[in-house]
Amino acid sequence: PMPMIAVQLLWLNLVANGFQDVALAFEPKEGGELSVKPRSPHEPVFDKHIIEHVLVVGSWMGLVAFLNFQWTLDQGQSIEEARNLTLMLMVLFGNIHALNSRSESRSLFKISLFRNPFLMLAVPLAQLAHIGAMYTPGLSDVLQIQPISVAEWLQLLALAMSLLAVE
């Protein structure tokens, strides 16, 4: 079975990318830009380092999400519940990835969270949009999602935080 249905993928693109992508455009400069050697005009925009990073991070998120989906099914949960948890995990991954994508060279832990107030508003807003959808009749039915337990929240948060070790 597929880990997510089409409408869930569309929703994921909205809540895991929509708010955060716009907010990242307001990320202040890091400083020291003038001391960095200019990139050659013949160098591709997506160099080896960026391609490698995208492959590693994307593979990690996909692998963890799929293994959690399969584990949920193996525990006797329904396909709908497994998809519900997979979607929440991917929303959490998107928020953590947005926070950690603020710099190419510095970790999330070395940059003040409040340097970009737009992102600090966008991340909780995206998460609240998804949580709100879980509790909204009609929308929760279309997305085939439902509220999750505290234990499930903790499990998904731990899995999503593993992304910080990979990035």
Each model region followed by its residue ranges:
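C-terminal transmembrane helices and immediately adjacent loops/tails
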Residues: 1-167
